Amino acid sequence: MTECFLPPTSSPSEHRRAEHGSGLTRTPSSEEISPTKFPELYRTGEPSPPHDILHEPPDIVSDDEKDHGKKKGKFKKKEKRTEGYVAFQEDSSGDEAESPSKMKRSKGIHVFKKPSFSKKKEKDFKIKEKPKEEKHKEEKHKEEKHKEKKCKDFTAADVVKQWKEKKKKKKPTQEPEVPQTDAPSLRPIFGAPFADAVERTMMYDGIRLPAVFRECVDYMEKHGMKCEGIYRVSGIKSKVDELKAAYDREESPNLEEYEPNTVASLLKQYLRDLPENLLTKELMPRFEEACGRTTEVEKVQEFQRLLRELPEYNHLLLSWLIVHMDHVIAKELETKMNIQNISIVLSPTVQISNRVLYVLFTHVQELFGTVLLKQVTRPLRWSNMATMPTLPETQAGIKEEIRRQEFLLNCLHRDLQGGIKDFSKEERLWEVQRILTALKRKLREAKRQECETKIAQEIASLSKEDVSKEETNENEEVINILLAQENEILTEQEELLAMEQFLRRQIASEKEEIDRLRAEIAEIQSRQHGRSETEEYSSDSESESEDEEELQIILEDLQRQNEELEIKNNHLNQAVHEEREAIVELRVQLRLLQMLRAKSEQQLQEEEEPERRGGTGPLPCEGVLEVRAAKEQAKPSPSKDRKETPI
């Protein structure tokens, strides 16, 4: 195939046309435009049929572009092609605007016909304007090329800046807003008013200080007195934030797992977040004025008077803080913290000037001599159900732990009744109830053991005396203790026997129900087996596999639901068991009270009878018989007054 291009303006054909005159045009011969004279005008290729469709002109490639042509892709070649057409259009339009003679010459070239050319190929030489879409594409390609050149010169900072600008331009998709409910949520402890924090996290011993302050001071008294630069060296921020979040959730983290500097930073953070000054805005100027007194006695007296005017919460917190810091200063050899260092650290934290802090630290005994830092005792935990926690051994320790657990139980009930839904608090509630049940049971056992030891001691002391003295001077207190113990044991035994019979009947009914259900299952399986032998299954293997998958999914779902129900059932059974024990205990106490009441009425009647008869008292030997008769009467029979314990 032979392709034809317009010759350049400086070609020999233009010179010939200029020599022949401007008014005449002639058709050039085949020799004048032969390929040997104009090698760039024709390009030989495969021959094409004479009436072929319209072909696009090939790309015009320069020498410089040929060197780099192998490194460029299709996109670069298309750019060159479009640029070549634009240049050709601008040159031709400019020539046409300059002189009409050139237009005529160009018409002459268009009129020229060669036998191998068709009418359709003549259209390739006509200059047409490109549509708007192609112009828009060209401009877009040029902009992209310009951006690529700029991107090569970009640094990392420029790339990050450009990415941020693109991110700002993008509008975030607006998600549908969820209607907010008015459910109460826990407010943070850090930054809360001091009185509010005290009411929410006060310890069981009644000292009106927040738990975070008490526990931090207690930890620092144990582990921070040998740490160099304590309160000056900051702790790890991530751990401090972790502890802060735990206290904001009203939890009690184990500070033993953290370093002293971390706990010290937590304490400073709490003091820094207090919404009000410890010395209050009204009294702060007066404290500053008191520092300017001439004598130390006047300073101390004025400070004592101003401290009495402080609110109760502020005075208590300030006294504990100053006494604790005085302990740190006393360990200056280990901590390397003297009055000046502590004042520099504490002044911006609590917003108190160095002058006031210096007076407080130098007169601790006169101002806070009666303050004693009481150690914190954590309530007992029972997080692992597989192991039993170590309970106190003495009655005093058990009673103290019961007070702690009851205080914690009341706090949990208050939070849950306030509408705050917290699964961890619900679990802690069950845990506290289990601990209380175990503690009360152990307290009863301790009282019983103490009573038995006391009785054994009394019996041992009485065995040394004569039999006659034992009969006449028998200790009424020991008899009463024995009777009370015997009555309590017998009544408790009766209640437990009644509960045992009730549980046995319930177990028997459950076994019958299990046997009935097993029989029904066996009958259903036999029916299905017989039906499978008589029926013919014509379903495809694909439908059977799908049914099996659906049945497997349903089975897994049912198993998961069954596990959840078993867990709930275990919790309910445990709660029912604990309630039954409490009911048995109450019934025993009720029956004991009834027995004591009947015994007191009987004694009153016996005392009234001798008075009616003339004041004749019973013989000494009759006293022993009456005591033994009272023992036999106080013993309840196992078959009498037996009641079943309902669920």
From Swiss-Prot:
Ubiquitously expressed. GO terms for biological process: cell division; doxorubicin transport; endocytosis; negative regulation of smooth muscle cell proliferation; positive regulation of mitochondrial fission; positive regulation of oxidative stress-induced neuron intrinsic apoptotic signaling pathway; positive regulation of protein phosphorylation; receptor-mediated endocytosis. InterPro entries: RALBP1, RalBP1-like_Ral-bd, Rho_GTPase_activation_prot, RhoGAP_dom. Keywords: Acetylation, ATP-binding, Cell cycle, Cell division, Cell membrane, Cytoplasm, Cytoskeleton, GTPase activation, Membrane, Mitochondrion, Mitosis, Nucleotide-binding, Nucleus, Phosphoprotein, Translocase, Transport. Residues 500-647 are annotated as: Mediates interaction with REPS1 and REPS2. Residues 24-33 have a biased composition (Polar residues). Residues 192-380 form the Rho-GAP domain. Residues 154-219 are annotated as: Mediates association with membranes and could form transmembrane domains. Its main location: membrane. The modification Phosphothreonine is found at residue 44. Residues 69-79, 102-118 have a biased composition (Basic residues). It is found in: Cell membrane; Cytoplasm, Cytosol; Cytoplasm, Cytoskeleton, Spindle pole; Nucleus. GO terms for molecular function: ABC-type glutathione S-conjugate transporter activity; ABC-type xenobiotic transporter activity; ATP binding; ATPase-coupled transmembrane transporter activity; GTPase activator activity; small GTPase binding; transmembrane transporter activity; xenobiotic transmembrane transporter activity. Residues 102-119 are annotated as: Nuclear localization signal. Residues 52-68, 119-151, 628-647 have a biased composition (Basic and acidic residues). Residues 535-550 have a biased composition (Acidic residues). It is a peripheral membrane protein. The modification N-acetylthreonine is found at residue 2. Tyrosine-phosphorylated upon stimulation of cells with EGF. Pfam families: RhoGAP (PF00620), RLIP76_Ral-bd (PF20924). One of its GO terms (cellular component) is mitochondrion. Residues 403-499 are annotated as: Mediates interaction with RALA and RALB. Gene3D superfamilies: 1.20.58.90, Rho GTPase activation protein (1.10.555.10). This is RalA-binding protein 1. It comes from Rattus norvegicus.
